[in-house]
């Protein structure tokens, strides 16, 4: 039984939480968040990139954008199963859709990817 954990973000910083846990060839993504830049016009700061096809499942611990804000990118060329509570999913969707409205064209995903997240 071999377990490897790759820290994608949140190490030495507040925000963009993400951990890729590999156990015997299965990849579980624990959170996949975003961190907003200090300057309003700068793009948000993303985690180390994970290819959607390399993720078997994702778990969102809670709805804050620093834990859920990048999850829709898993549906940009992929179709990952996402696990979380119903309230976490509902609030995550609301926050991510609001983020996309406010920060037009700054993200690698759009509302279609957010809707795919809902169906999974």
Describe each PLM feature range.
Residues 1-6, 27:
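Extreme N-terminal starter segment of soluble prokaryotic enzymes
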Residues 9-11:
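Short Gly/Pro-enriched turn/cap motifs at secondary-structure boundaries
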Residues 14-16, 23-60, 64-80, 95-120:
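Pre-active-site segment of Zn-dependent metallo-hydrolases
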Residues 80-89:
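Short internal beta-strands
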């Amino acid at each position: 039984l071999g377990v490897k954990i790759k820290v994608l973000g949140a190490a030495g910083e507040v925000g963009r939480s993400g951990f890729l846990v590999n156990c015997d060839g299965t990849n579980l993504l624990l959170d996949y968040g975003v961190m907003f830049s200090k300057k309003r016009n700068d793009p948000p700061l993303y985690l180390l990139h994970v290819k959607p096809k390399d993720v078997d499942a994702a778990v969102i611990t809670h709805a804050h954008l620093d834990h859920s804000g990048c999850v829709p990118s898993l549906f940009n060329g992929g179709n990952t199963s996402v696990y979380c509570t119903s309230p976490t999913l509902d609030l995550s969707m609301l926050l991510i859709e609001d983020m996309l409205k406010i920060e037009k064209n700054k993200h690698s995903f759009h509302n279609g990817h957010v809707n795919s997240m809902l169906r999974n």
